């Protein structure tokens, strides 16, 4: 979670699902994963491209934490044409990850920066994002490419947390995760 945005998203999803209080908390869940010899890598690339056996990696592990946009990438980049993605999306474990662009307070050209953000939010740019960044567009009017429509889903009820709660607790949660996973 400290070095990977999908890892952090998974940690946050477990906090939403199991909570911090009660008979079985997110820490208990992670302790159970640890006790079951879960493999944690330094980042998404190693996990997906090296260790995962189900995608384009030739690894030894059958499950991986990735993005809802991984199945279309598998279809698009398959060496041999395939009709169905070898990967899927488990909706119950999804956390909506949102990537931002912003203008810094003391930016030397805030007007130009604003125009660039407007450009990035425009339909042409947003419709170009899925097949280049393999993320969903922020502009709801942007059309998705067929490979996205056919090979993935947008989870209807992803886990969410108030951004202020994430900001206030992220470091503590990561430190507590470290204490559970790296005793």
Regions flagged by a language model, labelled:
Residues 1-5, 68-72, 94, 108, ...:
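Solvent-exposed loop/turn segments at secondary-structure junctions
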Residues 15-20, 34-38, 53, 57, ...:
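Sec-exported extracytoplasmic/periplasmic mature domains
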Residues 146-183:
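Extracellular/periplasmic bilobal clamshell ligand-binding domains
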Residues 12, 31, 46, 50, ...:
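Solvent-exposed, polar/charged alpha-helical surfaces in well-ordered, non-transmembrane soluble domains
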Residues 3, 16-25, 107-113:
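Short helix-loop capping/hinge motifs at secondary-structure junctions, enriched
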Residues 1-17, 97-102:
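Periplasmic solute-binding protein
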Residues 95, 101-161:
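Mature extracytoplasmic/periplasmic domains
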Residues 13-92:
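Ligand-binding pocket segment of bilobal, Venus flytrap-like solute-binding proteins
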């Amino acid at each position: 979670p400290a070095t990977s945005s999908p890892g952090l998203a998974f940690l946050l999803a477990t906090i939403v699902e199991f909570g911090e209080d009660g008979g079985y908390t997110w820490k208990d869940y992670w302790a159970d994963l640890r006790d079951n010899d879960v493999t944690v890598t330094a980042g998404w690339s190693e996990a997906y491209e090296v260790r995962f056996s189900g995608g384009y990696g030739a690894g030894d592990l059958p499950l991986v934490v990735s993005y809802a946009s991984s199945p279309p990438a598998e279809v698009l980049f398959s060496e041999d044409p395939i009709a169905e993605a070898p990967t899927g999306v488990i909706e119950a474990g999804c956390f909506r990850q949102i990537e931002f662009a912003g203008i810094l307070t003391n930016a030397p050209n805030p007007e130009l920066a604003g125009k660039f953000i407007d450009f990035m939010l425009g339909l042409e740019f947003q419709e170009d994002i899925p097949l280049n960044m393999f993320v969903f567009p922020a502009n709801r009017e942007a059309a998705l490419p067929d490979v996205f429509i056919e090979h993935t889903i947008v989870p209807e009820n992803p886990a969410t947390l108030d951004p202020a709660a994430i900001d206030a607790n992220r470091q503590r949660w990561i430190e507590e995760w470290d204490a559970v996973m790296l005793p």
